Amino acid sequence: MPQSTDLPAWRTLSEHFKTIAPRHMRDMFADDPGRFEAFSVRLGDLLFDYSKNRITRETVATLIQLAEEAGLREKIDAMFRGERLNVTENRAVLHVALRNRSNRPIRVDGKDVMPEVNRVLDRMRRFSQSVRTGEWRGATGKAITDVVNIGIGGSDLGPKMVVKALQPYADPRLRAHFVSNVDESDLVEILRPLNPETTLFVVASKTFTTQETMTNGRSARAWFLERISDESAIARHFVAISTNRNKVAEFGIDPRNMFEFWDWVGGRYSLWSAIGLPIALSVGMDRFEELLEGAHFVDEHFRTAPFERNIPVLMGLLGIWYINFFGAQSHAVLPYDQYLEDLPAHLQQADMESNGKTVDVEGRPVNYSTGPVIFGQPGTNGQHAFYQLLHQGSMLVPCDFLAAAESHHPLAEHHDILISNFLAQTEALMRGRTTDEARQEIASEELPPERLEALAAAKTFPGNKPTNSFLYRRLDPHTLGMLIALYEHKIFTQGVIWYINSFDQMGVELGKQLAKTILAELPGDAPVASHDASTNGLIRYFKSLR
C-alpha cells in the first residue's frame, strides 16, 4: 500500500495549505456566521466544538477524502471484526470487545471472545462486591480498608486516572493507592501509614515478568510477611491480574485469586479489562459498567457515524492537518476539571506509545512526522505555568479544552470562574490581540514613544492558535468512558492514515535490555569498560558515590 504522502488527497492538502496558512481565524468567523454550527458535533450531552481551527469546509472535505483513501472505514470494520491489525505481534486489537455492551459476537480466530469477557466481568463483580461489603476479610478477620495497585504503564496510568476522576463516586471506607516506579521511595511512602491486616495488594502485569512491577511486588510481599508471619495469609491479601498463571503461582499468589485478560488487549488500552479491578473496588462494579457503557456508546458512534460527523475521526484528521502540514510537534490536553488531573498523563502514554513510530506496517521508513508530544495540566493551573508559550511562543501547539457544565461540589462562584477561564482561553487563543489594540490599551500610560511601542509589541498576541472544546453536563462514569474512547479512536485514526502499527511498543525494549546488562555491572568495584565513554564514566562515578 502507498504511504500517506503518495495519496492524492495528501497532495491536494499540500496545495490547499498554501491558501489556508495566511488566513486568520478572526476573518474566518467574520466571513461565516454559521461556522459554529458547521464545525461542532453533539453526541449525547457532549458537545465537540472544532470551529476554532484553521480550517474551511474545503479543508474538512479534503481531510475526509484522505481518510477514505487511506482505507480508514475498512480498518475500523477490521478492528471490530477481530482481525490481526497488530501485524508485528500478529495479534487482534480488541479493547472494544471489553466494553461491548451489546454482547454482539466478536471473534478471534473464529472463537467468540464475549463469553470469556463476561466471565471475567462477573468475577470482578463478585470479588469487588465482597471486598466493599466487608465479606472478604483479611487473614486476621478485619475488613479491607486500603487497596494498593502495583503496576506500571497501562497497568497503572489508566486505572489511576479513572479512580481519581471518579473520586466523587468512591467508597470513602476503601482507599486506593498506586505504586509504579521501581524507585523504592514510591513503595515505601505508600506503605508507611498502612496496616497490613487491612491492606489488599493488586499486582498487575500481563506477563508477570515486568521488572518494576515484580520488584515492587516482591518488596510488598516481604513487607507484609515481616508483619504477619504467615505465608497462608498471602491468599487473603494479594490478588493478581495477568495472563501468566504459572508465574503468578511462582510468585506465591493463589491462581484462584488471578483475574485474566488476553493478548489482544494492549496495556495502554486495558483499563476496561481486569486491569480496571481497582476502579471496581473504588467505585463499585455498577459504576465500572457505566464507564464501559460510555465507551461502548462512542465505539458505536466511531463504527457507524459518517466521517463528517464522527468525532474521533475529526479529532484525528485535525491532528494530521497540524502535524503534517503546519509542522506542529506537540498537542496540549487541558481539562478544566481537577478530577481529570491525570488524564494528560494517561493520554501521553496512549498516544505517544501508540504512534511514536518511524516505520510503516510494511517496515519501510516513513518520510513524514507521526505522533506528537502530548502534555497538559488542569485549568487554571496550566494558565500560570505554560500558557505563555501557547499564546505568544514561536511554536504552534494545538490544544484540547475539556469542561463540565456542572460541578460535583457547588461552592460559591468557583465553577463559574473556572468556566469563564475555559471559555476565555479558547477565545484569546483564536482572536489574539493586534498591536493597534495593544496600543489603545496602554495609551494612557505616560511613557516615551519608543517604550510605548516596545510595550505594545510585548502585549501583542498573534492569535490564530487552534483549539478543540469538549463541553458536557457532568463528569460521571459514562461521560468519562466516552472521553477516553474518543481519544483512543483518534489515535487509531491517525495510525491508519500514517500507515503505522499503533499497537506495538518496540521502543520500550532496547533500554530495558541494556539495563539488565548494566544491573549486573553495578555491584562491586570492578572497572567497567564495555560501553561508550559516557556510560562507562557515569557507572564509575556512581560507584564512587556509593
Curated annotation (Swiss-Prot):
Keyword hit for Ligase: no
Enzyme Commission no: 5.3.1.9
UniProt main location, coarse: cytoplasm
Catalytic activity: alpha-D-glucose 6-phosphate = beta-D-fructose 6-phosphate
Alphabetical UniProt keywords: Cytoplasm, Gluconeogenesis, Glycolysis, Isomerase
InterPro entries according to UniProt: G6P_Isomerase, G6P_Isomerase_C, Phosphoglucose_isomerase_CS, SIS_dom_sf, SIS_PGI_1, SIS_PGI_2
Top-tier EC class: isomerase
Keyword Repeat in record: no
Any one GO BP annotation for this protein: glucose 6-phosphate metabolic process
GO function terms (MF aspect): carbohydrate derivative binding; glucose-6-phosphate isomerase activity; monosaccharide binding
Pathway participation: Carbohydrate biosynthesis; gluconeogenesis; Carbohydrate degradation; glycolysis; D-glyceraldehyde 3-phosphate and glycerone phosphate from D-glucose: step 2/4
Active-site positions on this chain: 353 (proton donor), 384, 512
Pfam families: PGI
Compartments, as annotated in UniProt: Cytoplasm
Gene3D superfamilies in the cross-refs: 1.10.1390.10, Glucose-6-phosphate isomerase like protein, domain 1
GO cellular component, one term: cytosol
Family in the record: Belongs to the GPI family.
PANTHER family: GLUCOSE-6-PHOSPHATE ISOMERASE
Function as written in the Swiss-Prot or TrEMBL entry: Catalyzes the reversible isomerization of glucose-6-phosphate to fructose-6-phosphate.
Protein name as annotated: Glucose-6-phosphate isomerase
Native source species: Methylococcus capsulatus (strain ATCC 33009 / NCIMB 11132 / Bath)
